[in-house]
């Protein structure tokens, strides 16, 4: 399990504490929280934890370091990440692994957001899901990050991730939503 403390960690701590009051989350890394969750709910533990990363890019590079340090060869990696950040995580991994490594994306949920009167809400309840405002905030931050331009994380910008094709309909929807929600 990979995850230190980043921009979503405090919210994750609150959600875990609310859903599982017996799991103490104060000052825990994301990996430590998921380890405690696995132990509490399923009675099992991960073999390895990476707890120092502070962002999606570190998650990838520190994961690869962990695999190398423990002499763990791989031909494929399953990425199971918060769906709002799944595509960026895969693009980060793609930047650092060889072309013959298979990246399997397994988003941990699939959320549909609908209009509920004057507000947004989830079409279905998803256990442990972000509050809708936080989810929209996360989503609105992803398109600028995924962009391969001078401001984005792609090779033409900060070069944190591999190139990602963003469909035109997604770009148009983002521009429309930005007028209401801002870009982050």
List each language-model region with its residue ranges.
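Short, surface-exposed alpha-helical segments at coil->helix boundaries
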Residues: 28-35, 90
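Short phosphate-binding loop-to-helix
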Residues: 49-62
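Conserved donor sugar-nucleotide recognition element shared by glycan-biosynthetic enzymes
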Residues: 14, 27-31, 56-59
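Short internal beta-strands
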Residues: 1-6
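Extended hydrophobic blocks
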Residues: 8-23, 37, 41-42, 46-50, ...
